[in-house]
Regions:
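P-loop/Walker-type NTP enzyme "switch/lid" segment
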Residues: 9, 13-16, 31-110, 116, ...
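Active-site signature of alpha/beta-hydrolase-fold catalytic machinery across serine-
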Residues: 27, 31, 124
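Short, hinge-like loop/turn segments at secondary-structure boundaries
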Residues: 57-61, 151-153, 235-237
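Hydrophobic positions on the alpha1 helix immediately C-terminal to the Walker A/P-loop
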Residues: 24
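C-terminal lobe/tail of nucleotide-utilizing enzymes
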Residues: 1-4, 175-278
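Conserved lysine of the Walker
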Residues: 21
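Generic structural signal for small/hydrophobic residues in well-ordered secondary structure
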Residues: 17, 50-51, 130, 220
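Conserved catalytic-core segment of NTP-binding enzymes
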Residues: 115-218
Length: 278
């Protein structure tokens, strides 16, 4: 139960938008709730608030259909409007830590949807992560987020700004906590791009993972179904519910399997020995 073991903090973070962070956060929340866990979410994406909108759509859908779906507890943390930087940072620290503390009382897992860009709130989230998931679009353009790579030899020239930031958060966290940050990079939207190019991205990522210490996970494919589910606030794991007018197809089955694979790869200690129930 949540009392015996402190809630695990999972941060879904990436400097860019558009890599499907909210889709991952939402599906992970529902997967954990379907496994009987209590989940709290914090939406730090101050600009887009996609996760908050996703959950609002979910509530609306339940009201209109009368269906009961698992809902996480959601907390919004706003950026400070203080002009003075020190004051702003201390206000944000206060807001963030009190939200985490509140959710830790009631939850087994806290999922934090990180903001795009390098902000103080984003760093706070990363320093507090037990598991960090970075969704990455499967292309060399997004690859820049992690490191600078020689396009000919695929040799890693230097880690990126984001990788350096994660590294410094890891060092900081190691001073205060016995839980190291387990960093997982997800290759999302593995479009049917030319196999050769895909292999090269894979090779470069493998080189980089050894160098800067993350684990690689296959991500979620580019499927229209994820986009179709957003307006109803549904996830793939809800599609058996009555009233969802989405017809269940083979691609839904495949996508649901991707979620199971992700959960297995995350190796969350709290789920050891548990059956995957979705």
């Amino acid at each position: 139960s949540a009392q015996q073991r402190e809630a695990r903090v999972i941060v879904v973070g990436n400097e860019k938008g558009g890599a499907g962070k909210s889709t991952v956060s939402m599906h992970l929340s529902v997967a954990l709730m379907r496994m009987g866990k209590k989940v709290g979410v914090i939406d730090l994406d101050v600009r887009q608030r996609s996760l908050t909108r996703y959950l609002e759509n979910r509530l609306r859908w339940m009201q209109s259909t009368g269906a009961k779906l698992p809902m996480p507890e959601i907390v919004r943390v706003d950026a400070s409007t203080e002009r003075d930087l020190d004051k702003a940072e201390s206000e944000e620290t206060q807001r963030f830590l009190s939200s985490v503390a509140r959710l830790k009382k009631a939850c087994d897992f806290i999922i934090i949807d990180g903001p795009g860009g390098d902000t103080y709130l984003s760093r706070l989230a990363h320093v507090n992560a037990d598991t960090l998931i970075t969704p990455l679009n499967d292309s060399f353009v997004d690859f820049d987020l992690l490191g600078d790579v020689n396009p000919q030899t695929l040799e890693v020239l230097r880690p990126s700004f984001y990788s350096e930031m994660v590294w410094s958060c890891r060092k900081k966290k190691a001073q205060t906590s016995r839980r190291p940050i387990d960093w997982i990079v997800m290759r999302n939207r593995m479009s049917p791009l030319a196999a050769r190019n895909k292999e090269r991205v894979g090779e470069a990522l493998t080189n980089l993972s050894k160098r800067i210490g993350f684990r690689l996970a296959p991500g979620l494919s580019e499927r229209v179904i994820y986009r179709e589910l957003f307006p109803a606030g549904l996830t793939l794991l809800d599609l058996t519910e009555k009233g969802s007018n989405v017809s269940f197809t083979m691609s839904h089955v495949a996508a649901r399997q991707e979620m199971r694979d992700l959960l297995i790869i995350l190796q969350l200690p709290e789920l050891v020995g548990a059956e995957i129930e979705f």
